[in-house]
Amino acid sequence: MSIILGIDPGSRITGYGVIRIVAGKAEYLGSGCIRTDFGELPSRLKQVYDGVSEIITQFKPDEFAIERVFMARNADSALKLGQARGSAIVAAVNALLPVSEYSATQIKQAVVGTGGAAKEQVQHMVTHLLKLSATPQADAADALGVAICHFHTRQSLIKMAGRATSSVRGRYR
């Protein structure tokens, strides 16, 4: 059994999603958003750090996954997003969690089956995959998608490692 914390970073709203892996299946533990005030950026970054640290204390995850920064049209927005992302990563590293990073395309591919999926499609599939009674808000759904992507990626790597050990001279046994 392991617990995965997924983060969808933002300088105003940072989504989080927590899943537990039991017998090869993902179970929903919690999700939500860390909303920062409209203060100066350093204050908002501290709020992201403190919020992620609090979630780590509450859920005690074993693994941490976060969305990579994409190139935004607005360079200032991309820089702020990167700084918020860094605040979340520092919280994970301080808690001695392994950190994995995924692009938006990888996350959408893992959750919906296509890298070009819309936010609504991600919300729908997260709701379906985790058997939720209500659709989570967009940022929380994206964070749950990050956690699901990490779970699927980890499962694929485990399967590939198993195949590699059963291979002799290029043949599978």
UniProtKB/Swiss-Prot annotation:
Its cofactor is Mg(2+). PROSITE patterns: RUVC. Signal peptide: none annotated. One of its GO terms (molecular function) is magnesium ion binding. GO terms for biological process: DNA recombination; DNA repair. One of its GO terms (cellular component) is Holliday junction resolvase complex. Keywords: Cytoplasm, DNA damage, DNA recombination, DNA repair, DNA-binding, Endonuclease, Hydrolase, Magnesium, Metal-binding, Nuclease. PANTHER family: CROSSOVER JUNCTION ENDODEOXYRIBONUCLEASE RUVC (PTHR30194:SF3). The RuvA-RuvB-RuvC complex processes Holliday junction (HJ) DNA during genetic recombination and DNA repair. Endonuclease that resolves HJ intermediates. Cleaves cruciform DNA by making single-stranded nicks across the HJ at symmetrical positions within the homologous arms, yielding a 5'-phosphate and a 3'-hydroxyl group; requires a central core of homology in the junction. The consensus cleavage sequence is 5'-(A/T)TT(C/G)-3'. Cleavage occurs on the 3'-side of the TT dinucleotide at the point of strand exchange. Belongs to the RuvC family. This is Crossover junction endodeoxyribonuclease RuvC. It comes from Aeromonas salmonicida (strain A449). The gene is ruvC.
